[in-house]
Amino acid sequence: MKKIIRFIKNYWVTGLLFLGLYFTYVYLSNNDNVNKLLFPPVDQIIKAFGDVNLTFFDNMLGSFGLMIPSLIIALIIALALGTIMGLSPFCRRVLYPIIYTVSVVPSILLSPFALVLAPNFKLASIFLIAYNIIWPTLFATINGIITIDRVYLDIADTLEIKGVKRLFKVLYPAAMPSIFSGLVTSIRGTFLILVFAEMYGTQLGMGYFVKKYTDYGMYDYAWAGLLFMIFILLIVMLAFEKAKERTLRWTINDK
């Protein structure tokens, strides 16, 4: 009961904002001056949900089939390279100019090259999504390691903590707030590339679902797909935020 009361106290304003958005849409859909095709009535969207609810989950799995491998690949590369650069001033001097140059290139601009060079569209999509995830996480890892308080390192030296144990017991925990911040930023931007990839080259995925029914002019189904996609992406972001809070509970004070 206390959790429910606390939830209401924290999010009642958010709930009012969502209600405001809902009633704004209801007003638009009932207004004769608004295109009924683009803004179908709410009951029509609800009916569309019922008609294609099983298809939603197939498309969700298709999206995760692209997102999860991309995330794993990007994390491995970002953590490995970020750790090396964070620990080695020489590597930072040599690689920083190259990384800054490459990282400013939007992944969407690389899509023609990825489509031509990759053996299939799925690998091209995974490359583009992973490319988009790597940079914020990489820079956050580097900054997290080079800004570690010297006290932690001195204590590790005193306790003779070295090698892999030093990495996982001292460096990564101390740098984790920065790493998580970069990762969450990466994931937010990744949804844009994920939807772009699905809209213009796959036959499965949440972005593909919305694009397909938009092309057909069935905007009630497109709205249903868009709302479902927003709901799923919101759950993913909340899950990462919860994982972040749990991992960094020793640094977070929300009281």
Where do the PLM segments sit?
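Short cytoplasmic-facing helical segments at TM-TM junctions of multi-pass membrane proteins
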Residues: 141-179
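Generic hydrophobic transmembrane alpha-helix motif, especially the helices
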Residues: 100-136, 143-144
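Periplasmic/extracellular loop-to-transmembrane helix junction in inner-membrane transport proteins
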Residues: 6, 30-72
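Transmembrane alpha-helical segments of polytopic membrane transport and secretion proteins
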Residues: 1-19, 238-255
